[in-house]
Amino acid sequence: MNILTMEPITSDALVFFGATGDLAYKKIFPSLQAMVKRGNLNVPVIGVANADWNNEQLVARARESIETHGGGVDPDAFPRLSELLRYVAGDYKDPATFQALRETLGNAQRPAHYLAIPPFLFSTVVEQLAKSDCTRGARVIVEKPFGHDLASARELNSILHSVLNEQAIFRIDHYLGKRQVNNMLFFRFVNSLLEPFWNRNAIESFQITMAEDFGIKGRGAFYDATGTIRDVVQNHLFQVISNFAMEPPARRDSESIRDEKVKVLKAIPPLEPANVAVSYTHLPSPRDERRYLVCRLLLEKWGGGGGGGGGGGGGGGGGG
């Protein structure tokens, strides 16, 4: 897919795991209504979770979500979304759950499976999808964080590749869907007046602040296992840093853009303890507390020249 044009990929069903979770409540349901409103969604939308719900309860959850986080229920789009919604209840480790999903998919040949679930469940769900014949012709969208560490990320990658080809795997960061983040590439590379000055000779440092006005209510278990760095820094904020500092890609395809982002990340030396401050690290179970992190990064060889750190970046994340 061309990231700069955001060309859509056609699927004939959308399955999202974690239908009763926080990401679905805050992001997915409002996005689904927006897609219906724009005419971009007219296929079955199947929510999967372990809560003992039915279709009507899923629709009610979608309504509450959109009223709270989506700017209100659209009188035309929401009824159409309601007709598309289906619900499959069951344990992700139970093959019967995925057999029920296979039956609910019906004649769908190109389903898209969106894993809006905790990372430790990714492998289980992918393997169960394969065993139930739900991966044939399918695409799998994996949310961040991708693994808990390097070893688990490699293991997850291996499992995905054992049942899907690379073109069918989408490792996504929903933060990149924010208009300001996505438009940064246009802002930089289309602006012929600005880009010549976007280098270490004109920019001494830049600061990125991610300030959130909500805590971790309802997500204590996830946050205790994940933490600020895995939740928002090594994905959300590093993507923003990459967009800010990457060189113009040779082509506007996803691989060329990815390659330039990788160059930025490789140019950042390992963090030194003196450049990192984390709050609440000594509390045994700060479930009701905000997490906070600030760090100073050095970006070596920015702008194509030699020499040392040309820029610095800081990121703070709270609540997640």
Residue ranges and their predicted role:
Residues 281-289, 293, 305-320:
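Conserved small/polar residues in nucleotide/adenosyl-binding loops
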Residues 147, 304-305:
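Short amphipathic alpha-helical "recognition" segments used for binding
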Residues 1-141, 146-283, 287, 296:
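Secretory/organelle targeting and membrane-embedding segments
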